[in-house]
């Protein structure tokens, strides 16, 4: 089936020096291999994540670059694409909340939960992507407050200005799903 290839790129101040390179600390410690193994664990646990296919870590001297290949989630769109209209679908937003809660209950802390890292698939399926720097502690429920605050900031940033009044309605439905 179709796949997605994602290169690991730096952001923030570190990107000034190098957009692609990281300090090489070994293949198993590389960001691409850590995310590959985490996705494999989450997929095996039945959580809605893309199935990992391959990881790449190339190094020269003390620097490395990396990439991750996953199966494409067909017919999926980022949650950001749903931020239109002034009447949000409460059912969809509740499913998003329930899905995030599943991850937290399973012990997953997502380092960058935002409207681009939540995919809406066919039949109200919700998937999370981009688990770079995420943490997984099976059997330990995660306090999701930080993740939810990050998502709320992302919603405020990406929601169209002329329809901002719909955001609290969507957020309330998301939290109702999360709290079920």
Task: Locate predicted features.
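Conserved ATP-binding subdomain of kinase catalytic cores across diverse folds
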Residues: 1-77, 98-106
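Conserved hydrophobic "DFG−1" position in protein kinase catalytic cores
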Residues: 72, 120-121
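Short acidic-glycine loop/turn motifs at beta-strand connectors
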Residues: 1, 121-123
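Hydrophobic residue at the +6 position relative to the catalytic HRD Asp in the kinase catalytic loop
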Residues: 113-120
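AlphaC helix of the protein kinase catalytic domain
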Residues: 78-87
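Conserved catalytic-loop position in the HRD/HxD motif
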Residues: 107, 112, 130
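C-lobe/activation-segment region of protein kinase-like
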Residues: 127-180
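Conserved short alpha-helix within the protein kinase catalytic core
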Residues: 90-97
């Amino acid at each position: 089936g179709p796949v997605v290839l994602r290169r690991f790129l730096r952001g923030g101040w570190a990107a000034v020096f190098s957009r692609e390179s990281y300090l090489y600390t070994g293949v198993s410690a590389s960001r691409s291999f850590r995310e590959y193994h985490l996705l494999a664990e989450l997929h095996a646990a039945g959580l809605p994540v893309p199935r990992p296919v391959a990881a790449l870590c190339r190094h020269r001297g003390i620097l490395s670059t990396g990439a991750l290949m996953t199966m494409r989630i067909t017919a999926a769109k980022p949650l950001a694409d749903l931020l239109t209209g002034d009447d949000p679908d409460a059912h969809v937003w509740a499913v998003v909340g329930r899905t995030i809660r599943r991850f937290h209950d399973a012990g997953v802390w997502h380092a960058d939960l935002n409207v681009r890292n939540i995919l809406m698939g066919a039949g109200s399926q919700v998937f999370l992507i981009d688990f770079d720097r995420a943490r997984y502690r099976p059997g330990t429920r995660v306090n999701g407050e930080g993740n939810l605050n990050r998502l709320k900031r992302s919603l405020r940033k990406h929601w169209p200005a002329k329809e901002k009044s719909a955001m609290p309605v969507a957020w309330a439905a998301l939290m109702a799903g999360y709290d079920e």
